[in-house]
Every structure is written in structure tokens, then in C-alpha cells.
């Protein structure tokens, strides 16, 4: 008999991200039938279990004790026990404790059964109106300003949709950093309190988002926020803004075409060749 048959099973069980109704029948049945539940926060998980009349043994597995508790869980799995891993909200391991446990299970060939379920990033993305074909998930934005800004700068020309989490305490600073490092005109969506009473999903250019948040503190003073940034798009000739065309036209009254194009490209961050092509087309009209 191989080691896979001797050991137990680790179930990765997603839990609601706000609305207690957002849990699958399979998830509830799994929580009822496993030998024990490894929870990020026992008190928080007990609220969910009581709601669904689930009675089971709970142990704590959080960011502070994850490495130590993973060893305990592994030993229990080796005895043939079935164990469920849950976080406070959403899918475990995704920005939540559980990585070390899952990694050890993979190394030891202990079977893992992941259940599908809630994830704030994916839920927000589905309703954002921003491309979902390709995206990168960056987790929580760094709390330190320089590290955060360096990360944002590195993503300025990322063509995929970008997803972040951010706290209510830093949302204004992070939006400011997006404006200053990426582009004030980049389209964003912010989704707060997904599935909860005060849920909202709002999309606009970055500078408008910042003004909108500042108008009413209640828009960001509670809950965590998902930030979704539209991917970088190269400006094509037809996409040259009216402001850029106006700048080029004014400069042409005083400077050569070469000088006018150079200055306009710097101001509006447009390729010089696109501006040349536009000027030539206008001349030929």
C-alpha cells in the first residue's frame, strides 16, 4: 500500500467573504464530516459553524503559528485523519495562512482536495467591466510608501489587468501613488465590502476615483477594498487625444514640426512617430 493510501485528506474549504449564504452545500458537508478543522481564527469560524449547525473540533492555524501548526496537522494526516483548512473569509492560502501546510502535503504526497468557492478578487473582477481574459493578482499593496511606489512603477506598462487588495487606512495614499506612478487617466475600479451590506463597485479614471473618495469618508472608512487597474494600452494614431492635438497645433505656430512633435510627445507621453503621422495626414487634407 503506497503512502497516498495510508494518509488522510486535506480539504481546502472556501468560506463566505461577507454573506453567510455564500457557501456551497459541499463545503458545509465537508466541515461536518472531517475529523478536525484548521481555522485562521477559531472565534470567527465558530460563527459560521453555528450558523450551519456544524459541530466539530477546531484548531488554530494562522500567520503567527502556521509553521508549527502545519507540523501538527501533517502528523494527524499521517494517522489517516481528514482535515479541513479554512480562513476567515474566501479561499484559504490566497493571501491567507496555509501555504506551508499545502507545500508540505505536496512534498509528502498527501492528497489535497480543493473545493471551489468565494474569492473577493475574482468576484470583483467579474463585475468590473475591465478585461478578464488576462490578469495578474498582486495581493495587498505594500504598506511602505517607497516599496509600494516602486512596485507600481514596475507595473506601469503591464498590459494585463492588475488586481490589488488595499485597506481602508491606505486607500487614499495608494490611489495617489497610482496617479503619480502609473497615470492619472488610467481607468480603475474599486470594489468595497463585496457581498456585504455596504457593497459598492465604482469605476473611473484614477484622478476621479480619488476625488470621489475624498467627497465622502464613508466610501472608504470601512472594510477592505479591491483595486482593479486596466492594463496598459499603446496609443495608436487614432487615439491621440484632443489635448495632444491642440498642443501640437499651438506649438506649430512658433516652432518647427520636429520641435513641436518632440515637446508634445514629452507632455502627453505619445510616440513621436504617431504625432508625425498625424501631422502629415492633417497637411494632406
UniProtKB/Swiss-Prot annotation:
Pfam families: TP_methylase. InterPro entries: 4pyrrol_Mease, 4pyrrol_Methylase_sf, 4pyrrole_Mease_sub1, 4pyrrole_Mease_sub2, rRNA_ssu_MeTfrase_I, SAM_MeTrfase_RsmI_CS. Its main location: cytoplasm. The keyword Transferase applies. It catalyses: cytidine(1402) in 16S rRNA + S-adenosyl-L-methionine = 2'-O-methylcytidine(1402) in 16S rRNA + S-adenosyl-L-homocysteine + H(+). It is found in: Cytoplasm. It comes from the Bacteria. Transmembrane segments: none annotated. Coiled coil: none annotated. CDD domains: RsmI. One of its GO terms (molecular function) is rRNA (cytosine-2'-O-)-methyltransferase activity. PROSITE patterns: RSMI. Its EC number is 2.1.1.198. It is an enzyme of class 2 (transferase). One of its GO terms (cellular component) is cytoplasm. Catalyzes the 2'-O-methylation of the ribose of cytidine 1402 (C1402) in 16S rRNA. Belongs to the methyltransferase superfamily. RsmI family. This is Ribosomal RNA small subunit methyltransferase I. It comes from Buchnera aphidicola subsp. Schizaphis graminum (strain Sg).
